[in-house]
UniProtKB/Swiss-Prot annotation:
Compartments, as annotated in UniProt: Secreted
Domain remark text: The cysteine framework is VI/VII (C-C-CC-C-C). The presence of a 'disulfide through disulfide knot' structurally defines this protein as a knottin.
Source species: Californiconus californicus (California cone)
Signal peptide: 1-22
Annotated protein name in UniProt: Conotoxin Cal6.28
Physiological role: Probable neurotoxin.
Length: 63
């Protein structure tokens, strides 16, 4: 009985850690959109996390 409870708690903790890690990876990928946006003729569209030419409008925000 005690072993079963320990195993259930361990599985719950590991599942929570995986969810947190996946969420963090998603946030890093989202923020990466403007990371390489540098130069004299480009700009960062923060809402869409995109780097575009200064001659173009920002794309709509990603969901």
């Amino acid at each position: 009985m005690k072993l079963t409870c320990v195993l259930i708690v361990a599985v719950l903790i590991l599942t929570a850690c995986q969810v947190i890690a996946a969420d963090e990876a998603t946030n890093r990928a989202t923020k990466r959109g403007c990371l390489m946006c540098w130069g004299s003729n480009v700009r960062c569209c923060e809402k869409a996390n995109a780097c575009v030419s200064i001659n173009y409008e920002c794309p709509k925000a990603r969901r």
